Regions:
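Extended, low-polarity transmembrane helix blocks
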Residues: 1-36, 54-59, 63, 70-119
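Membrane-interface interhelical connector segments
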Residues: 35-54
């Protein structure tokens, strides 16, 4: 029976790939919801496409998520998206309160640190 170190060598790259693909797909879904309202969210209208903050945010989420899911330019994209999430947290969530659970920013923080991990 192989030891833990041997199992880790076999499964670690596979699990990191699955994590990267799933984060990329889910992040793309967030961008599509912002840009074209797919999947539809009740009480939510899509943002104007090339407005400065929400439109650019949606575009970064779609393009960055697809690149991340495909494994293209992963480190560069992850660095850009981590910075994007940090800015989004401080611009959109911090004014609503200090604690991430109360200001709706916990998912933004999770994405930011996952992107930093991929960087």
């Amino acid at each position: 029976m192989p030891g833990f170190a041997a199992l880790r060598l076999i499964w670690e790259p596979r699990m990191l790939s699955i994590l990267r693909i799933m984060v990329g797909v889910l992040y793309t879904e967030h961008g599509l919801a912002k840009m074209v309202d797919f999947p539809h969210q009740p009480n939510h209208a899509p943002y104007a496409l090339f407005t400065l903050v929400p439109g650019l945010q949606g575009l970064l989420e779609v393009v960055g998520g697809l690149l991340l899911a495909l494994g293209l330019f992963t480190r560069t994209v992850a660095f850009i998206l981590a910075g994007n999430m940090a800015v989004a947290y401080f611009m959109a969530h911090t004014p609503r309160g200090f604690f991430p659970l109360l200001n709706g920013g916990e998912l933004v923080i999770v994405y930011c640190f996952i992107f930093l991990y991929f960087w």
